[in-house]
Curated annotation (Swiss-Prot):
PROSITE patterns: YCAO. Gene3D superfamilies: 3.30.160.660. This is Uncharacterized protein in tfuA 3'region. Pfam families: YcaO. InterPro entries: YcaO-like_dom (IPR003776).
Length: 420
């Protein structure tokens, strides 16, 4: 299948109308059905085990893992959800999508950035991609693939090093590889929606880290104010386990609900053995605030279990060391332990929408804040019964760590606001 045909298939799916089967996830079929579809293919993608980690912790919030020993990045992947099927599917899909991103297409175009610009080729706006430093790329030819700008409907060239994943050997100069925006789904549209939400979440988290302590304190949310039964169950499990839950509203001017959840022992300040792994966080984003909050809470639980299982290849030894109460960590602990009043979440009007309508809503909000491109690169695979894409949105921020990270105007304006 040609790259042009792949983009046509993606564009066609984005014009369809398909709804999720549950109030709690955007999938055309249930997580159990998705897992049943991909299970026969797991070994072909090098995935040797998928299992549950939930019982290793006291929270009883479903968390799963998938193992792929010969990965070019991490060899263990995590998944979370509101039930076991969702967690298992989440872990397996993450392992699958990462493997797919390791396979470079045979028809990559080799060209320098300068030659692309000289020929006025339609390309992604590298000057505003957070994980790219154009001045550091150099004058050597680099590989390019084709993506679809869903705002204009046009094909654009994208450097493969912004799309694929390979952490072996030397990293390509000028690019900070990451899994941000790499997503999968039962259909291309499902995958695009998941990738978009993740990028808006990363932007919100990056800006949250730049806010003043006063602004953060004002952002604390009472989980009970959502009035959702599943959030109430999760909160009750955390409390019964002797833990505290901090929920911060990270929603930016984009207007798509985004939250940070932090779980820590209720007696952390009294413990002489307090460690970094005792304070675990997670983020979530979705136009439906309940889904956004649940993603944050379940990801915080996933962070705890990942530390307990010791299953991340890229863990720093520091995570198991005594908590030294650095300024940033002290701030988080104080927010968790503070007795100040939490504000109720003011729900924005949210109506049930199809997956494609939800993508359109997010795209409209991004355009309203100055975003000019939303680029999607599909990863077609003949044997795979699900879809994998990479979504890239020039102009959105990412966590400010890495050699080739560009600080954008959204971050600059947040810093100015914190200083004023």
């Amino acid at each position: 299948m040609s790259a042009f045909t792949d983009l046509e298939t993606l564009a066609g799916d984005l014009k369809r109308s398909s709804a999720g089967v549950s109030d709690y996830h955007d999938r055309a079929v249930t997580p159990a059905q998705t897992f049943a579809a991909i299970r026969p293919h797991l070994r072909d993608f090098g995935i040797t085990r998928v299992g549950l980690l939930t019982a290793l912790d006291v929270l009883n919030i479903p968390v799963a893992f998938a193992t792929r020993p010969n990965s070019h990045t991490l060899s263990v992947f995590q998944g979370k959800g509101i039930d076991n099927e969702a967690a298992m599917t989440s872990a397996a899909m993450e392992a699958v999508e990462t493997r797919i991103a390791e396979i470079a297409p045979a028809d990559l175009t080799q060209a320098t950035v300068e030659s692309m610009r000289a020929e006025r080729a339609a390309m992604i706006d590298l000057d505003n991609v957070a994980r790219c430093a154009p001045d550091e790329i150099g004058s050597r030819p680099i590989p390019w693939c084709s993506g679809l700008d869903i705002l204009s409907g046009s094909s654009v060239f994208v450097p493969w090093w912004l799309v694929g994943l390979d952490h072996r050997g030397e990293r390509p100069p000028g690019f900070e590889q990451s899994s941000d925006g790499l997503a999968s789904g039962n259909t291309p549209s499902e995958a695009v929606l998941h990738g978009l939400c993740e990028l808006v979440e990363r932007d919100a988290w990056a800006l949250t880290q730049l806010k003043s302590p006063e602004r953060l304190k004002e952002s604390r949310i009472d989980p009970a104010s959502f009035g959702d039964a599943v959030i109430d169950v999760m909160t009750d499990r955390i409390t019964r386990a002797g833990m505290k839950l901090l929920l911060l509203d990270m929603t930016t001017d984009i207007g798509i609900p985004a939250f940070l959840a932090v779980i820590m022992p209720g007696n952390l300040s009294d413990r002489v053995d307090a460690r970094w792994s005792h304070v675990c966080g997670g983020c979530g984003c979705h136009p439906d605030p309940v889904r956004a909050a649940l993603r944050a809470i379940t990801e915080a639980a996933q962070s705890r279990l990942t530390a307990i299982a010791g299953s991340r290849d890229d863990f720093s030894p520091r995570i198991y060391q005594r908590l030294d109460r650095s300024a940033a960590m002290q701030q988080v602990v104080e927010l968790c332990e503070g007795d100040g009043r939490m504000r109720p979440f003011q729900p924005r009007h949210h109506r049930k929408a199809t997956i494609q309508e939800t993508i359109g809503h997010i795209a409209d909000r991004l355009v309203a804040t100055g975003i000019e491109q939303i680029v999607v690169v599909p990863f077609p695979h003949p044997a795979l019964p699900v879809s994998v894409v990479r979504v890239i949105v020039p102009g959105l921020e990412v966590d400010i760590s890495g050699q080739y990270i560009q600080l954008g105007m959204r971050a600059v304006n947040t810093i100015r606001g914190a200083e004023s």
